[in-house]
């Protein structure tokens, strides 16, 4: 997939192939996070002992926002498939702009679900993938680092729904124009949903978790991530939020 060539990006098969590759990345990021405790203090704003000068927020927010500032300076967020968690902190790069062609509608950056992704990650995903409950102050930095990797992978996967939505819109402009004009959210949701594809995703994730989630050379080794939890995360979080992204993007598609 080449973002300088829109025809490769809006090809549904290319999009599906990219989403499959993202599965591997997300699984491995989850496995890395699974070595640590839940560490709730990392997510608590202004937690005693984790106060940060001139910053109001959690240790994770501080680490993530500062990383995004650095990444913005090297053009990360110029790429159409990257969505920042702190868009108001993004800085202009000193590198020459790549000048990607317009692939998505101009309002696409405004379709940003990262606040929701971060909230559901902390509240629902962390308890499923962590080694145990509780804090481990010696590993706060490592935990935040792994969390950022997980969040960025989830964000990219979920916001790829904008490319899915644009490709589907282009594939049947009359149908989607009618649905958008009538603000038929249910109709849009019905047309973007492919239950057979979703079922294949869950089946594939089950197999991947069975293979990746345990060390095959250690028969007594603990399973680092279970197929049940991985399927639950995709079925109840990743897929539904991706479809929310698609619907919001499509509802605005006829804007001038």
UniProtKB/Swiss-Prot annotation:
The outcome of changing residue 226 to D is:
Constitutively inactive. Unresponsive to tryptophan activation
Any single Pfam family the record assigns to this protein:
CM_2
Tell me the PANTHER family matching this sequence: CHORISMATE MUTASE
Using the record, list the residue span of the signal peptide; answer none if the entry has no such feature. Answer: none
Outcome of residue 76 to A? Severely decreases tyrosine and tryptophan binding, resulting in loss of enzyme activity regulation by effectors
Task: State what this protein does.
Answer: Catalyzes the Claisen rearrangement of chorismate to prephenate. Acts at the first branch point in the aromatic amino acid pathway where it steers biosynthesis towards phenylalanine and tyrosine, and away from tryptophan.
What does the record give under GO molecular function?
Answer: chorismate mutase activity; L-tyrosine binding; tryptophan binding
* Location relative to the cell: Cytoplasm
Relay the activity regulation note. Each dimer has two allosteric binding sites that can bind the regulatory effectors tryptophan or tyrosine. Can bind either one tryptophan or one tyrosine, two tryptophan or two tyrosine or one tryptophan and one tyrosine, which differentially affect the catalytic activity. Activated by tryptophan and subject to feedback inhibition by tyrosine. In the presence of both tryptophan and tyrosine, the enzyme is in the activated state.
Gene behind the chain: ARO7
Domain spans labelled Chorismate mutase: 3-255
What is this protein's record name?
Answer: Chorismate mutase
Q: Name one GO biological process term.
A: L-phenylalanine biosynthetic process
Q: How does it assemble?
A: Homodimer.
Q: Which reaction does it catalyse?
A: chorismate = prephenate
The record's InterPro entries line, in alphabetical order, gives:
Chorismate_II_sf, Chorismate_mutase_AroQ_euk, CM_AroQ_sf_eucaryotic, CM_II_prokaryot
């Amino acid at each position: 997939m080449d973002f300088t060539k829109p025809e490769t990006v809006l090809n549904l098969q290319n999009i599906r192939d990219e989403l499959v590759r993202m599965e591997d990345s997300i699984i491995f990021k989850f496995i890395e996070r699974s070595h640590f405790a839940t560490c709730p203090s990392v997510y608590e704003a202004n937690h005693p002992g984790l106060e940060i000068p001139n910053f109001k927020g959690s240790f994770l927010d501080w680490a993530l926002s500062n990383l995004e500032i650095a990444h913005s300076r090297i053009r990360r967020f110029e790429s159409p498939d990257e969505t920042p968690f702190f868009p108001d902190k993004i800085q202009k790069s000193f590198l020459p702009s790549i000048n990607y062609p317009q692939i998505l509608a101009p309002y696409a950056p405004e379709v940003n679900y990262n606040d929701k992704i971060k909230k559901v990650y902390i509240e629902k995903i962390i308890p499923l993938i962590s080694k145990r409950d509780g804090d481990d102050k010696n590993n706060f930095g490592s935990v935040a680092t792994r969390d950022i990797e997980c969040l960025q992978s989830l964000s990219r996967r979920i916001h790829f729904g904008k490319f899915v939505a644009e490709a589907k819109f282009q594939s049947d402009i009359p149908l989607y124009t009618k649905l958008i004009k009538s603000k038929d959210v249910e109709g849009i949701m019905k047309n973007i949903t492919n239950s057979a594809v979703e079922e294949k995703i869950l089946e594939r994730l089950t197999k991947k978790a069975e293979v990746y989630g345990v060390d095959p050379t250690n028969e007594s080794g603990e399973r680092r991530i279970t197929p049940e939890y991985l399927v639950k995360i995709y079925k109840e979080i990743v897929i539904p939020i991706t479809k929310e992204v698609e619907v919001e993007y499509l509802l605005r598609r006829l804007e001038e």
